[in-house]
Amino acid sequence: EFQKDEIFKGTFELIDTASTIKLSFAEVLLQNNKTIDTANVNYGEASYSADGLVSITTPEGTSYYYRGVVNNNYVRFANNTWRIVGINPDNSIKLILEKSATSMNYSVYNNAIDYTGLKYIYNNETINNNISTYLEQWYQSTIINNNFDNYVVANSYCNDSSNFVNSYHTYFNGYTRLITDKHPSIICPTTNADFGGTYKQKVGLLSADEVAIAGGVYGVDNYNYYLYNGETFFTTTPADYYNFVANLFIVTN
């Protein structure tokens, strides 16, 4: 079930290093999977079947995301088993760990809106949230220290902090997209907040929008789609802030 609240899974971008004579990794994935345009997907319904790759066009180019039941997206890399999430516009491959790397809180605190950010500014200093610090340490010990860093490229991770206030209740725009409209987006809104936004880095978390594209729907149980692994994990998408409690979207077990 896809909910808002508070274990996480790490994701990062894998660069294709195949020879130009051969098909690239991205081309092989496209050749072996059917594609469907995002305009033809009903995101108000969870996906319980093999839908293939959803194509989404953005100013950066076309991205592809696996949706629904997927049995051919397993990858072994850096001594870990991963699932392929999709293809980025630069043909790098987005992966997610099959099992969570750890169990921990996203943030030490949740009594301020800023704590929904992967990073936030305090006294003119950028502070890593709990989860960001762990991601950096995990990447160092698992990827860099084992000489896999050259295979990984930085990509954009969206921690959408854009929001509006209604009767003292702050709603993030992810709340509107995923609960009200059921219309996920991989375009990250610009923000002037002192937390969140777009982060260009080599490791991160999926957004709730990406979970929705994969086949999840807020408040609906789905034990069939490939992101379900029996664990609860965070996304980077804040949901709301009310009565001194900040909530993020999570994927429940």
Task: Put a short name on every predicted segment.
Residues K22-N253:
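Long, domain-scale functional regions
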